[in-house]
Amino acid sequence: MPVRFKGISEYRSKYKGRTSRSRSDSPHRRMRLAGLRSDQSGITQEPQFISKRRVPFYPSQVSSSFRWEGRDHSQQQLEKSRSPAVSPVLRATSAERQVTPLAPRDPPEGTTAPSQPPQAEAAQTSTFAVQKQKQALNGINHALRMKAGLRSEHQRNGLNSEYQRQFMWKTPVAESPLLAAHQMLYSNNRAIPPFKTNPVIMESEYKRSFKGSPLPRPPRLRRDVEQYEVPEFLTESKTPEKSKRKKKKKERPHSRKSSPEQEVAYLQQQEVKSPHNLKDPSPKVMRKGKTEYRSNFHSPLQYSYKDGAWLKIKSAKEEVKELRERAEAYKKRAWGTHFSRQHLNQILSDQNWMWEPSSGTSSSSIESEACRSTSHIIEALDLARAGSVRESSSPGHSASVVVSRRSSSGEVGLPEEPTLPVQRKLAWDEEEQLGEREEIVQDRLTDKEGKTRNENGMERNERLNSLESESLSSAEEGSEASVNGGRLPTPKLKTMQTVQRTHHDRTTPSIDFNLHYIAKAANGSLPRSSPVAGLTTVDVLPMREDVWSDEEVTDYRSLKPPKPSRKQQSSQRHKANAAPPANRIQGTMRNAEFQHNGNLGIFRPELFVLPQSDSALSDNDDKMSQISSRSAASCSMASEVLGRAQRRKQEFWGKS
């Protein structure tokens, strides 16, 4: 007899996972082993360490849910239902069992009563019949899968790894005798063509977003297009969904405040309308796509092509508005260029006597306009005429007025001759001869420069002779009055002028809109401020007699003509109207006295300094002699600029 070895080898006792697995058991009934702790899988002892010596064999302690016997599932359920009691080991394992979506939906163990009514047994037999039918269908499903070349659930490949045996899909394919379309997508059989869709989307972006061409528009009238200038494609771009919402809002006003009865009536109306809405809508254009052509298209009704560009046609109202704006801009430009507030500030300033006078021709127009002007500013500044009116009543001032008029008549032919500002008159008329000396010095300087004007020199000598005789008599009277005990003039506060620059420095034009500059004096520049009372001053030009030699003085006096008569003086007064102003500008525009920078009339205590000593020489200037001389230039300048601006304003749109 052949010897048969009936013992179990060590390999078979340890590795019998594949042989013990039942093929008929459904994968839905299995629990996965991976990820479970030893106590959850029914193992109560930790495994011993592997050593070289032989380790005794212990049967594996696995819960009943992991044991796959060759018996059917229906027989196991019959045994469980027939058993009157449950073993304690099964209770422990059932409590430890994890509930998952893939776990078997068995009734809880131990809950069935030992004695069951016949109705329950009939129900169980019906369930068994249903399960048998499912298994038969399972076989059909398996056969169909095999024919289709698909891998069935019962088909096991010998290359399955432990991971594939223990882990199943969480959402397995539903069992069905019919082949679903998605089961045929991944076929391994080459004989059967795969029913796969192309993963690459063949539809282009243009086709996907294309909505179709709109319906042709009905004919429109031209007046409608002109009346509504908004293009129609902007109005058509609204989606019908938004328009429907607006209609609903209009149809259902004050819905929040309505009563429940009104709500019910409204819902019934909507239900009546709903059958019409269920109909398939006709293919409508949802939204009009904005193409490049439409974005760059300009309608010839609203745009005109001019100079290579499309310009929007303006209405009559817009054209009138534009023309008015242009006219206003031209008017402002003309006023701002020729007569501005800055020029007015320059004209009204107290320092405009520092500016250049006009020529002989323009000065006549200046004086004539000044006499004719009715402006309050010019009347207030025109104190020279006021002094001439008072000449008859005040004999003390007559000499100074005569001097100014004579000098102006004599200087008609000398517009470029440098002169000094008018000398202030003291409280008493004892030093009126200082002005005569200045005129002598000025004549001497002009002779040295090479300007030979004999006729003018003869006229000046005549005037000097007459002035010397008048000044000697007035000086004697003034000295006697001062010796007898006259009142000294009250000293005044003087301002310390600081050098400041303004926009008038080189920007403000004089006559004919050209800047005229005056050359500085030969021996130096003018003082920046007037001398303080009681202090000796250094003359800019030599004005003392000891500077000249006696021979020069005798030669100069020998040239003096006889004194003119009263008639000649009156005729010279009439000629003075055509002469330039008596007091010309001295220095340049950069002179500190002119750089007021708008600080006139502003009281600053830190700029005032008290006089250091009281003396007979004071700065209490005579108002008529100083203000009249300075206002003459301002009056002439203001009147000329103002008259020119008025003429330009009148002739702006053409002479009428």
Swiss-Prot record:
GO terms for cellular component: centriole; centrosome; cytoplasm; microtubule; nucleus
Bias (Polar residues) ranges: 38-48
Biological process (GO), any one: negative regulation of centriole replication
Segments carrying motif ST]-E-Y-X(3)-F motif 1: 161-167
InterPro entries referenced in this protein's UniProt entry, alphabetically: MDM1
ST]-E-Y-X(3)-F motif 3 (motif): residue ranges: 291-297
Coiled coil: 309-337
Pfam families reported in the protein's UniProt record: MDM1
Biased composition, class Basic residues, residue ranges: 243-257
Positions with biased composition (Basic and acidic residues): 68-82, 434-465
Motif (ST]-E-Y-X(3)-F motif 2): 204-210
Principal place of residence: nucleus
Location of region: Disordered: 1-126, 208-264, 386-504, 550-589, 614-638
GO molecular function: microtubule binding
Biased amino acid composition, Low complexity: 111-126, 398-409, 466-482, 625-638
Cited function: Microtubule-binding protein that negatively regulates centriole duplication. Binds to and stabilizes microtubules.
PANTHER family from the UniProt entry: NUCLEAR PROTEIN MDM1
Protein name stated in the entry: Nuclear protein MDM1
